[in-house]
Curated annotation (Swiss-Prot):
Protein name (database record): ATP-dependent zinc metalloprotease FtsH 1
Binding site residues for ATP: 257-264
EC number: 3.4.24.-
Self-association state and partner proteins as the record states: Homohexamer.
Described purpose of this protein according to its UniProt entry: Acts as a processive, ATP-dependent zinc metallopeptidase for both cytoplasmic and membrane proteins. Plays a role in the quality control of integral membrane proteins.
Entry coiled-coil feature ranges: none
Provenance organism: Salinibacter ruber (strain M8)
Topological region Cytoplasmic: 1-33, 186-686
Membrane topology per record: Multi-pass membrane protein
Segments traversing the membrane: 34-54, 165-185
Gene: ftsH1
Record keywords, A-Z: ATP-binding, Cell inner membrane, Cell membrane, Hydrolase, Membrane, Metal-binding, Metalloprotease, Nucleotide-binding, Protease, Transmembrane, Transmembrane helix, Zinc
Amino acid sequence: MCFCIVSSPEAMHSNADSPSSGPGLQPVWTTLRSPYVFWIGGAILLALLVHLGIKWQQASAPVRIEYSTFLEHVESGYVERVEIVNGKRINGTYTAAAVQNDRVETRPPPAAPMGAVVDRSRRAFATHKPTAHELTAFLRRHNEAATGTGTAPVTFAATQESDWVGTLLLWGLPLGLIVGIWLFFMRRMATGGREEQIGSDTAALFEEAGGRRVTFDDVAGLAEPKEEVAEVVEFLRRPQKFTRLGGALPTGVLLVGPPGTGKTLLAKAVAGEAGVPFASISGSDFMEMFVGVGASRVRDLFDQAKERAPCIIFIDEVDAIGRTRGGPGGAGTGERDNTLNQLLVEMDGFDSDEGVVIMAATNRPDVLDAALLRPGRFDRQISIHKPDRLERADIFRVHVADLRLDASVDPEALARQTPGFAGAEIANVCNEAALLAARRGRNAVQMDDFDQALDRVMAGLERSNKLISPEERRVIAHHESGHAIVGWFLEHTDPVVKVSVVPRGLSALGHAQHLPKERDLYSREALMDRMTMALGGRGAEEIVFGRATTGAKDDLERVTETAYAMVVDYGMSDRIGPLSYNRAERRADGPLFEKPYSDAMAAAIDEEVADIVREARARANDLLREKRPLLDEMAERLLREEVLGVEALVALLGSPPHGEYAWLKEGDGTSRNSASAEGASPSSQG
């Protein structure tokens, strides 16, 4: 048996750092330097010592006998000496003759020459005295009788022992074990199991400047945000340029934008361009169930940052700790408030010339505490929006740079097909296209792979094996044809680029895809056209089959939401007037219960919304009755071909009456796809 005894963490540290340690031994010494290895080794050594102690005690312990057997041995003259300990335990010694003649039970003898004197330890025995028996009187009577017969009497004595060791083991050991376990879990929970990230050692938290750097070249698009943060880079590179004139750069930069737009990547690029350490942490990492843990982590983080200055601290999802204190319904917890207070103190407690820049990201700036946004803290806010067409093309070029592409792949065409896509979504499309090409055994990623990847990302995975009855297929085909025809002939709708009755995703039974126009303002006529197009599927069902199905559930939800927004938010109702009740934009620190309008106004709003939806439904049904032959022909073609692209739609419906599809004339090969799908579910075909 071989044992490895570890003396102390300091000894291991000195050995690991010795020059004799070769490169191959470094992982071993790194493991041995862990405190867990030290404690495990100590526990193994302690268990070994306890095991050896038990074995030794068993080897030297006297043989135990029954009390009745003890009394019989006394009467037979086999007992030489008796010691009564604390009135209960009896330790005795047999006579040598009784042991030699095997009159009594003893432990096995050790190896010894013949005729040797019997070992006294072999003659020892022990038993336990019942409380009711008077052993002393019994031994006196035995000795008196033995004197008359000439037999040797039994020597006996009563003693008292204080078993403080047993008491200590009985009470102290369990108590110490419980306290140790409690302290261990308290420490683990206080650090969240991340002692190596926050606290005395933040090596894993900080990415040093010597590693692989992310630069502005890796961040496609975001031209305006990069210009804003370029000043931070210049400050970290040459701080004296600003300090010599007495100016101070803002120490806090808040990046605001939707998810996936590149906020974290931009912060890393700032650190990479400046060549300084970068600390990235999520706002939720500060939060624990124990009060004071979050504040302690904030202090440790800023202490480490000051030691590594110049550096950048990036807090992702800062709204996790920066929410408004004392919000409606007690929105802030005590721990979060303490953490936020400590963050405010730290941000207000160091000078800008220390070289520590704090960057944070959130997609909920409306819920942040006002003290966090005041001058001197996060006083510079940079908005990061979803990329436009030119920026999307640049992002596609970055993500396809490592792919083996076919000559048919055009980033400009892909950018035109993906309005509203963020950088993370574009990266997902490129990755899906590469996986599809590999699955098909191709040597390069083709444009068709990107087309299929777009369908998969927007509408879900194709479910070609889903069983649909012929009657339901006819309903789905007319439903999607109704969407396409209404959208094709209205002025303010998005161009229809694809119609499909192939089931996709978890619930889509069919879908009509549109290419959204990149615009920010919508008139009342534009919103009415969009609602009319959404009701085209239900209208086709009513006209052809005389009834509506549950397939229009999602369409009705979108229409209802748009109609309420027109009346309540945008003031587009002549009956209600140009009023906005901000129903979708309540402030986080506003009152929890607020009645924005009277019951009479609520009833008027409901009636106006119903009138708007009925108007859109009537427009859709009138247009579909006018185009009934085209509706039936398109549905039949969908039942045969399952998918109709733009070229097939133009051949079937003719040129759009409100202008050609300019992007189709450019010959970019996008007639097979689009960017936005009106998906379907079991209760909504699209």
